[in-house]
A protein has these predicted regions:
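N-terminal single-pass transmembrane signal-anchor helix
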Residues: 1-29
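Short amphipathic alpha-helical/adjacent loop interface patches that line ligand
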Residues: 15, 42, 49
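N-terminal helix-rich module
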Residues: 24-39, 47, 54, 58, ...
Length: 155
């Protein structure tokens, strides 16, 4: 009687090939996740700036984009606020939150590193500067530049 089946060598070779394909797919999947997270953060920043410009025109006075929380790190999100002239306190208009553990986001502006002033007059100057996104895992760096007219460019 003849016994059929795979030999140990054939089984080990098939498992090694399967492991190689699995490693290749996991690296590709990790890269895809990193790219999607980067694009989501950049698009969120662009959307926040566009929404802020519209709200400033609608409200008729300058408003501010501030980091979410009390620090100068924008990694947790940003807050759109206006200054109440009667109470001299900032009031929340809208907030954006993102949970990005691998990205560090900082704002380097001309007049301030902890706020962006959004003008209510479209052709009047507003804060300009750069959002610098640094990936802690891959050391990737993305720069989102905001010019004085509110246009956004990604480098």
């Amino acid at each position: 009687m003849k016994i059929t089946g795979f030999t140990l060598l054939e089984t080990m070779l098939a498992l090694a090939l399967l492991l190689g394909l699995l490693l290749l797919c996991s690296w590709s999947f990790f890269s895809l996740l990193q790219n999607n997270e980067r694009e989501t953060l950049v698009n969120s920043i662009k959307t926040a700036i566009q929404y802020s410009k519209i709200q400033a025109i609608h409200l008729g006075h300058p408003i501010y984009l501030l980091p979410f929380g009390s620090n100068e790190n924008w990694s947790r999100g940003m807050v759109l606020a206006e200054l109440n002239r009667k109470s001299n306190k900032t009031e929340l208009i809208y907030q954006w939150q993102w949970s990005s553990n691998s990205w560090n986001i900082n704002w380097k502006g001309v007049d301030s590193n902890h706020r962006i002033i959004i003008s209510n007059i479209p052709n009047r100057a507003m804060s300009n500067g750069k959002f610098i996104l640094n990936n802690r895992r891959t050391n990737e760096k993305v720069v989102v530049t905001l010019n004085r007219l509110g246009r956004v460019r990604v480098e």
